């Protein structure tokens, strides 16, 4: 562990259109090779598509999707006595949100088709309805933590 000063947490700015920190975090996760304008366009087009399809506020759909994909428990590998145990740990809210955003984007990128706007909007709508690969990944992580509950006493 480093003995130097700990890094100061930076505050997350809000995006200019929806004034939401969550949308800004999503745009930052979409970002590839520094093309921020493209990331903004992808996210805003996906939001318009969600609004057109569901007739609901797109921010509420995105927030519900992230909430449904956010894990509460994760497992961490810990080596003890020559064997490796999967130790269940609680997830901090910031990490949970970051994992949910990462999984939603990964699931959207792995969908078939070429149109990223359609893939992202469909994954967000699926996650808000508690289906889709991002929610499945969260459930899988919870199942692994439940299966390894016996090792919860081990310190990480």
UniProtKB/Swiss-Prot annotation:
It is found in: Plastid, Chloroplast. It comes from the Eukaryota. GO terms for molecular function: rRNA binding; structural constituent of ribosome. This is Small ribosomal subunit protein uS7c. Belongs to the universal ribosomal protein uS7 family. Pfam families: Ribosomal_S7 (PF00177). One of its GO terms (cellular component) is chloroplast. PROSITE patterns: RIBOSOMAL_S7. It comes from Nephroselmis olivacea (Green alga). Part of the 30S ribosomal subunit. HAMAP family: Ribosomal_uS7_B. Keywords: Chloroplast, Plastid, Ribonucleoprotein, Ribosomal protein, RNA-binding, rRNA-binding. One of the primary rRNA binding proteins, it binds directly to 16S rRNA where it nucleates assembly of the head domain of the 30S subunit. Its main location: plastid.
């Amino acid at each position: 562990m480093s003995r130097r000063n700990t890094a100061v947490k930076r505050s997350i700015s809000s995006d200019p259109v929806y004034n939401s920190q969550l949308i800004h975090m999503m745009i930052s996760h979409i970002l590839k090779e520094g093309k921020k304008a493209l990331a903004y366009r992808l996210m805003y087009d996906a939001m318009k598509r969600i609004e057109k399809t569901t007739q609901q506020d797109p921010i509420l759909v995105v927030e519900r999707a992230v909430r449904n994909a956010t894990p509460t428990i994760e497992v961490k590998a810990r080596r003890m006595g020559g064997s490796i145990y999967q130790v269940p740990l609680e997830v901090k809210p910031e990490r949970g949100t970051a994992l949910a955003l990462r999984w939603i984007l990964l699931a959207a990128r792995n969908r078939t088709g070429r149109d990223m706007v359609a893939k992202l909007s469909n994954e967000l709508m699926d996650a808000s309805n508690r289906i889709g690969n991002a929610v499945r990944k969260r459930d899988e992580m919870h199942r692994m933590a439940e299966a390894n509950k016996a090792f919860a006493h081990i310190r990480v």
